[in-house]
Curated annotation (Swiss-Prot):
SUPFAM superfamilies noted in UniProt: Class II aaRS ABD-related, Class II aaRS and biotin synthetases, YbaK/ProRS associated domain
Upper lineage: Bacteria, Pseudomonadati, Pseudomonadota, Gammaproteobacteria, Methylococcales
Main localization, broad class: cytoplasm
Segments forming a coiled coil: none
PROSITE patterns, per database record: AA_TRNA_LIGASE_II
Name recorded for this polypeptide: Proline--tRNA ligase
Subcellular location, record wording: Cytoplasm
Record GO biological process: prolyl-tRNA aminoacylation
Nucleotide-binding is among the record's keywords: yes
Amino acid sequence: MRTSQFPLNTLKEIPSDAEIVSHQLMLRAGLIRKLAAGLYTWLPLGLKVLRRVERVVREEMDRAGALEVLMPVVQPAELWQESGRWEQYGPELARLHDRHDRAFCLGPTHEEIITDLARNELKSYRQLPVNFYQIQTKFRDEIRPRFGVMRAREFVMKDAYSFHLDQESLAQTYDAMYVAYSNIFSRLGLRFRPVLADTGAIGGSHSHEFHVLADSGEDAIAFSTVSDYAANVEQAEALAPTAPRPAPTAALLKVETPGKKSIAEVSEFLGVPPHQILKTVAVMQTIVDDDGLDRDMFVTVLLRGDHELNEVKLGKVLGRFRFASEDEIERHMGCRPGYIGPLNLPAGTAVGPVYADRAVAVMSDFVCGANEAGYHFSGVNWERDLPLPQDEYLCDLRNVVEGDPSPDGLGTLRIARGIEVGHIFQLGTKYSAALNATVLNEEGRSQVMLMGCYGIGVSRVVAAAIEQNHDERGIVWPEALAPFQVALCPINMQTSARVRTTAERLYAELSAAGFEVLYDDRKVRPGVMFADMELIGIPHRIVISERGLDSGALEYKGRRDADNQSIGIDGVIEFLRERSESR
C-alpha cells in the first residue's frame, strides 16, 4: 500500500485528555479518533490491527471446535427480566424503548441471548457438547470511561458460551478454551499469564483470567518463582503462618499518640515497624433478621498493619457488607476512626463479632488503638492482654505480598502488574436454570444444561499490546499485530529516477513475496518519514538512497534494533523472512 493511497493521520502533540500511553499512541499514530466519551472511530491503520486480532481469535476458536454465530446488540428486556439481571444491573445497562414502548437494552454481554437460543435449538443430549462464539460490539454505559479503548463504553469482544450435559464435559471444554486462549496470546506475540480468578458478578464455580503483563496494568497478579502457579491477588491464598507466636517480652503500656491516626504516622511516631501494629477495620455486615428483613451488624476485622484487606475474601466470609461510617464507628466503639482497637472497649459499646486475618495470630508485643482519641496501646499480647479470636473467626482476609510462600507449596510469590484481556468461567446452571434451558438426557428426562462462558476483549487487546510494547518514539508492534510488516522509505525519489525505479521494483517484489508493505511515496523530509514509521510501529524499515545504491546496498533497521545495518539488494526478501521468523 502506498501512503498516497493510505494517508497517515499522525499527530505530533499528545492530546490533552489521553492519560495512558496506549491512548496517547493510538491517537498520535492515527489508529483511532474520539467521537464522544468512551466512543471511538477506528481509522484504517487501527482497523488493520483490530482485524489481525480478530483473525487469530477466530482461527483458534475454530480450531478448538467452537461454532461462530452473530447475535443482536439490541436485546429484549424480557430475557433479562427472566434471568433476574434487569433489576440487578446498574445504570451501566443502557435501556431504551422502541416505538411500541417495548423495553430493550444495548447488550453489555450475551448470556441471556445465547441461553434463549440454546433452549430453543438444543433438544437432545446428542447435540451436546456445543460451543457457540461471536465477535461482536458491546456497550456498557460506564460512569467514567477512561484510557481510550482500554475502558470504553463501546468495545469489540469475542464471547463464547458452551452447553453440556455433565461436569466432565464442561471441564473438557473449559480446558480446551484455556489452551485456545494461551495459543491466541502466544501467536499475537504478547507476554501474558493465565491466573486463577474470582468469578465475580458473572458467577460460576471456576475461573481464570488472562493478563497481558505491563507495568501500567491495573491488576496485581501473584505468581510462584518455581511453579506455574499464578492467581489474581484477589484470589491468591495467603497461607497461615507456620512459625509459633513469640512469647511476650514487653509490658502493656498506654501511650500518647496525638494526631497520629494512620499506620504510617503511628509507625514513625513510636518507632515501630508497620508489621508490629494491629490494624482494625470496621464494617457493617448485612444479615437477615427473624422477620426476613435485612439489617446491619457491626463487625470488626483485624489485620497486620503492613497488610491490605482483601474485600473479595472478606465478602466470601461475611456475604454482603459495607465499610462503617465514622458516626457508626463512634456509636459502636466510643471512638472516632484512627484509634479503634480490640482492647479496652468502653462499657456498653455494641461491638459485634471480631474477625482476624490468620497472620494476626502470631503477632506479639504489638501496637493497637486504645479506643480513646490520641492514644494507642503498645506491648499488647494475645491471651495475656486479650483473647485471640476463635478459629472460626481466623480467616484468610488479606492480599498476598511479594515473598509470601506460594499456595501450592512451591517457591515464593512475586507480584506483577497485568491488564486483563481474557476471562473464562465454568458457569454451571446459573443462567440455564433461570431460563429453563433443558435437553432430554439418555433416560428421556428433561435436564438443565451446564454452561461455560469465555470472553476476550478484542479491542482491549490492541491497547494492552501497546502498553507492553512501546518506547519513547512510539509503538513497537509484535510481528503478528503490526498493520504492515515492512516500511519502504525511498529518499528523494521525486528527484532521483534510480531511487524511484529501485523502490518500485522492491515494492512489487516484496508484495509478490507475501509481505505487507507500506510504501512511503510522500514528498517529505527523511526525518519526518522515519518518525512516522517508528510512531506507527512497523517492524522492518528499508531505506533506499543514492548513497546506498552506489554500493549496491539498502539500509535496514528493525523497530526493536538500536542501529541500522546494510543489506544487499538482491538478498532483501530472504533477509526479511529470516528476521520475521526469528521474532
